[in-house]
Swiss-Prot record:
The modification 3'-nitrotyrosine is found at Y17, Y376. Phosphorylated; phosphorylation increases after nerve injury in regenerating neurons. One of its GO terms (biological process) is intermediate filament cytoskeleton organization. Residues 141-236 are annotated as: Coil 1B. This is Peripherin. Residues 1-16 have a biased composition (Low complexity). Residues 97-129 are annotated as: Coil 1A. It is found in: Cytoplasm, Cytoskeleton; Cell projection, Axon; Perikaryon. Keywords: Cell projection, Coiled coil, Cytoplasm, Cytoskeleton, Intermediate filament, Nitration, Phosphoprotein. Residues 403-468 are annotated as: Tail. It comes from Rattus norvegicus. Residues 94-404 form the IF rod domain.
Amino acid sequence: MSHHSSGLRSSISSTSYRRTFGPPPSLSPGAFSYSSSSRFSSSRLLGSGSPSSSARLGSFRAPRAGALRLPSERLDFSMAEALNQEFLATRSNEKQELQELNDRFANFIEKVRFLEQQNAALRGELSQARGQEPARADQLCQQELRELRRELELLGRERDRVQVERDGLAEDLGALKQRLEEETRKREDAEHNLVLFRKDVDDATLSRLELERKIESLMDEIEFLKKLHEEELRDLQVSVESQQVQQVEVEATVKPELTAALRDIRAQYENIAAKNLQEAEEWYKSKYADLSDAANRNHEALRQAKQEMNESRRQIQSLTCEVDGLRGTNEALLRQLRELEEQFALEAGGYQAGAARLEEELRQLKEEMARHLREYQELLNVKMALDIEIATYRKLLEGEESRISVPVHSFASLSLKTTVPEVEPPQDSHSRKMVLIRTIETRDGEKVVTESQKEQHSELDKSSIHSY
């Protein structure tokens, strides 16, 4: 009896379900019953933890009361009660664990269905984003880039035109600077000539003043000579008159000789006086003519110098005005060039900022797309992990169902104490088992549960009754 009970205990505790999940399997209560007709029966929960799917494992009929009407036979109720309690505890634990596993499996199924729905929604959003948003964003970016390139080309052409104008203005400015330098040099030459002319004018003025002083001195000298000549003439006249008087006086004595002598002397003095007067007049006239010519030349030179000075002054004024105008034009052109360069720099900075902003938006879109792809990949990985876990649970459940579907042999035999040497052998008994097969499938994100029942008959092992 103890041998059979230990074999039953070892057969119950060494199931594949306990080896897979750790704790002992759970069984439903009410497994054993012992009737008044000495019949022992057992049942076990099969399938997915449903208490309705039970099968009778077997029944042992004790010898009839008429056949075993011996006063000394009795049953070992204590061993049967211990086996019954152990089987009940094991079955209740197995039922509880199967219920927990079913709940966990249902949670996993719900989670998988939720994740599949999210995956389908994200896949739809991703396909929509791939089909619309990137193309539209790419189209908008390409359009913006084309517009920016066109504006950059226009700005480049405008910049080239401005550079050509700047080069032309620089050439004109160089020519104007060269002309300004030439005019400045001419002005300096004119000023130098003006200084020289002023010096010449001053020299001519000094010469004129000197000549005027000389003329005055000569006029004074001429007046003095005239006076001296008049005095000499008067003296000569006086002397002539005195000589005439003397001649008249002498004529009386020496009239013929004195008259001739006086006539000769008078003729000589008259000739000398006429000659001196003529020479003085000629010298005066020549000096006057020379001084007049010199004065005229000096006046002409002074007039020419003044005219040239006025002309140089007018040229200097016109060149100064022209230089001022050119300077104003140059400053205006330089200011316009700086304004154009600043405007071009601002526009180029704005376009570069716009291009950078579009590139940043494109980069953000790419990063968002990459993030969606990573999330999608993570969801795919989670789905694959859940599929693998579901497949593992499915394999475990299929293995457990296949293990449960194997015919269950009898796990206990009753020992009767008797003094009769021969005991009627027990009749062969058959067990009937109802197997409940539950199949859980996931189709298009929905859980499909199918159940089927199968009735099996299996022959129980024959157990011998040992007597003491």
